[in-house]
Amino acid sequence: MSGSIEEIPLPDLLQLLSTSRKSGVLSVNNGVSIGKIFLRKGQIYFSTINEDFSVSPQKAIYRMLTWETGTFELEPGGEMQVMNEVQDSTEGLLMEGVRQLDEFRNLQKQLPPLGSPLAVPTPLAGKLRDLTPSELDTFQLVLDHGQLQKVLDNFPGTDLDAAQNVISLMKREFVVVP
């Protein structure tokens, strides 16, 4: 089975594969990246983009749900042993992914482009003790990686949570775009 994401959006395709209890590897190519979604009897149990295993399977799925153009192909078989299987149902992943996508799109107006550098100004505008643990983690990622996309990639939670933290840090002048 193969086709175009423009004709069958990824959420609709995954719902179809779930209800028909298909197994295999769904390869999705958006022209820039290649995503793979591993299915067992209609349930997503793993996913990756460009075989980058440092990004969680859930985060990879949520990111692929943003792809509006490209092609897909379902290849039978391809069972893979993984340490970090997705526990959520396919329907649960889709509902949460679409919700996060909507919220992330609303926040994007407040974010710089994904490839933008991020920096920590000196002196700091406030006290680090005023930050939440999650904001401190994001602050550390800005120090370590210095680019929005890398902060999102390395944040242990969702892209939405990381984006909310970056916006909060920027508003309070803990982080700037140089």
Listing of model-derived features with the role each one plays in the protein:
Residues 1-178:
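Acidic, Ser/Thr/Pro-enriched low-complexity segments and adjacent helix/loop capping patches
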